[in-house]
């Protein structure tokens, strides 16, 4: 079966994007792993699948698969690429796009110069909604992870995040502490691990070890998580520039009960076909 796809990226966080509206597709875990291989496949951090809406009030359903084949609930950089893809492919002729994900609904707004703003929804701090094993919600948690003692924030942006403040992201133990924290026993569905350096109240630097992927050049939900944790701890203002290895995102959050808005680029790289 010959499948059409597009290769896209958001700040270097790269995706294989597939139209599941006009063509019938199915991807097994093994097929996704092979396609994700950067030497023998197409190579990507996540596969994004556009499906018809489950709800008639929405435009599409948005599915995300990590390079290891696991399906996840949300991907912010992917959401921006999703919006640009459906517009480029003529699947919709509006700039405002409402989609469902495995964890809820998000609204995508196409702006000028390949920029997309995404309403990422309301962050969840309640442990049961992250999910995270704790008696009650706290602004910071003290966790033991092998020989490490870690102070972190925990939040869900539709997927679970642990945010660790570090003096310098350049020296952060992403490769060593990242995989340990990803599988920490208090995160029953594993977790994305962010290492955040405070530059000032309006700017942070961030590196993210993504669940099921490893470190990526950018993580949209990770940027949102880091900012809302920083704001909740009284360290950041309502609008923050996040510098990731792949570039910059703007994150805005007005506080508890309010949605998080993420603005950043979505780039189309090439189109292709592959035999499945």
From Swiss-Prot:
Function, as annotated:
Catalyzes the stereoinversion of LL-2,6-diaminopimelate (L,L-DAP) to meso-diaminopimelate (meso-DAP), a precursor of L-lysine and an essential component of the bacterial peptidoglycan.
Q: List, alphabetically, the NCBIfam families matched.
A: DapF
Record-listed substrate binding positions: 13, 46, 66, 76-77, 159, 192, 210-211, 220-221
Matching entries from PANTHER family are given as: DIAMINOPIMELATE EPIMERASE, DIAMINOPIMELATE EPIMERASE, CHLOROPLASTIC
What PROSITE patterns does the database record attribute to this sequence? DAP_EPIMERASE (PS01326)
| Alphabetical list of Gene3D superfamilies matching this protein | Diaminopimelate Epimerase, Chain A, domain 1 (3.10.310.10)
Q: Name one Pfam family in it.
A: DAP_epimerase
Keyword set, alphabetical order: Amino-acid biosynthesis, Cytoplasm, Isomerase, Lysine biosynthesis
Question: GTP-binding as a keyword?
Answer: no
Q: Which reaction does it catalyse?
A: (2S,6S)-2,6-diaminopimelate = meso-2,6-diaminopimelate
Keyword DNA repair in the entry? The reply is no
Enzyme Commission number? 5.1.1.7
Organism in which the protein naturally occurs: Aeromonas hydrophila subsp. hydrophila (strain ATCC 7966 / DSM 30187 / BCRC 13018 / CCUG 14551 / JCM 1027 / KCTC 2358 / NCIMB 9240 / NCTC 8049)
Which gene does this sequence derive from?
Answer: dapF
Write the protein's name: Diaminopimelate epimerase
Identify a single GO molecular function assigned to this protein: diaminopimelate epimerase activity
Q: How does it assemble?
A: Homodimer.
What family does the entry list?
Belongs to the diaminopimelate epimerase family.
């Amino acid at each position: 079966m010959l499948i059409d796809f597009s290769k896209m990226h958001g700040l270097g966080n790269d995706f294989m994007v597939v139209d599941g509206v006009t063509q019938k597709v199915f991807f097994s875990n093994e097929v996704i792993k092979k396609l994700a291989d950067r030497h023998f496949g197409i190579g990507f951090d996540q596969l994004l699948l556009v499906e018809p809406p489950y709800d008639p009030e929405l435009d599409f359903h948005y599915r995300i698969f990590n390079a290891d084949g696991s399906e996840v609930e949300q991907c912010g950089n992917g959401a921006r690429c999703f919006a640009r893809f459906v517009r480029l492919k003529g699947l919709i002729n509006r700039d405002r796009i409402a989609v469902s994900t495995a964890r809820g609904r998000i609204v995508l707004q196409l702006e000028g110069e390949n920029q997309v703003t995404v309403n990422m929804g309301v962050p969840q701090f309640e442990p049961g909604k992250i999910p995270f094993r704790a008696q009650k919600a706290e602004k910071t948690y003290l966790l033991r992870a092998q020989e490490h003692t870690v102070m972190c924030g925990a939040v869900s942006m539709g997927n679970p995040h642990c945010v660790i403040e570090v003096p310098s992201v350049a020296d952060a133990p992403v490769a060593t502490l990242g995989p340990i924290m990803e599988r920490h026993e208090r995160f029953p569905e594993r977790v994305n691990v962010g290492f955040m350096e405070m530059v000032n109240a309006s700017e942070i630097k961030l590196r993210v070890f993504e669940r099921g992927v490893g470190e990526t050049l950018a993580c949209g939900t990770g940027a949102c998580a880091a900012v809302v944790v920083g704001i909740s701890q009284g360290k950041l203002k309502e609008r923050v520039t996040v510098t990731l290895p792949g570039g910059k995102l703007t994150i805005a959050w007005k506080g508890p009960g309010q949605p998080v808005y993420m603005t950043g680029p979505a780039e189309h790289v090439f189109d292709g076909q592959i035999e499945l």
